[in-house]
């Protein structure tokens, strides 16, 4: 069960930066990066467009290379994007970053995760394998968001309404 547990964990953690962060902490994300809702929507559109195109070729690449190598590379590359995000980049750089994440999370990762899950399930347990994967990802997502909100509330010096931008960063 170690393999499927790692797939579950990586399958959710890789989407933390491009999806979860901006969704859960939307008002703060908008303020910290000096964005409006239209600009955030544009970032998600850039991500979605690159991801859509990446699905086509991601399956091909997952057949040519070992899934565990692709997963490791995609996690590392996505984390590098997190380093860029931590530097509070401009809107232009954010658009490039979200396109980059479309490549790292879908082109490199998604097909490899699906293939690794299929291999783990074997010939007769595909349904169980994908049920474990999706159920586990949902549980990990709920846990991460709850933990994130708890940590955020602990470190927030004052009420969110009266906190300044420096406290939110």
Please annotate each region the language model reported.
Residues 108-122:
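Intracellular juxtamembrane helix-capping segments at the cytosolic ends
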Residues 1-24:
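Pair of pore-lining "gating" transmembrane helices in MFS-fold secondary transporters
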Residues 20-34:
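Membrane-interface helix caps of multi-pass secondary transporters
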Residues 81, 92-108:
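Hydrophobic core of transmembrane alpha-helices in multi-pass small-molecule transporters
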Residues 130-153:
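Glycine-rich segments within core transmembrane alpha-helices of 12-TM secondary carriers
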Residues 76-90:
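C-terminal ends and interior cores of transmembrane alpha-helices
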Residues 42-60:
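Central cavity-lining transmembrane alpha-helices of secondary-active solute carriers
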């Amino acid at each position: 069960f170690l393999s499927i547990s790692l797939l579950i964990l990586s399958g959710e953690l890789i989407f933390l930066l491009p999806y979860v962060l901006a969704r859960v902490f939307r008002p703060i994300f908008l303020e910290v990066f000096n964005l409006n809702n239209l600009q955030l929507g544009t970032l998600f559109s850039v991500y979605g467009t690159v991801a859509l195109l990446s699905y086509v070729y991601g399956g091909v690449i997952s057949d040519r290379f070992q899934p565990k190598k692709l997963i490791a590379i995609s996690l590392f590359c996505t984390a590098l994007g997190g380093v860029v995000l931590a530097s509070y980049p401009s809107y232009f750089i954010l658009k490039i970053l979200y396109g980059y994440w479309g490549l790292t999370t879908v082109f490199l990762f998604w097909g490899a995760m699906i293939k690794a899950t299929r291999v783990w399930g074997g010939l007769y347990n595909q349904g169980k394998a994908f049920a474990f994967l999706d159920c586990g990802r949902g549980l990990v997502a709920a846990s991460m968001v709850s933990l994130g909100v708890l940590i955020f509330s602990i470190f927030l010096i004052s009420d969110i309404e009266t906190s300044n931008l420096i406290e939110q960063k």
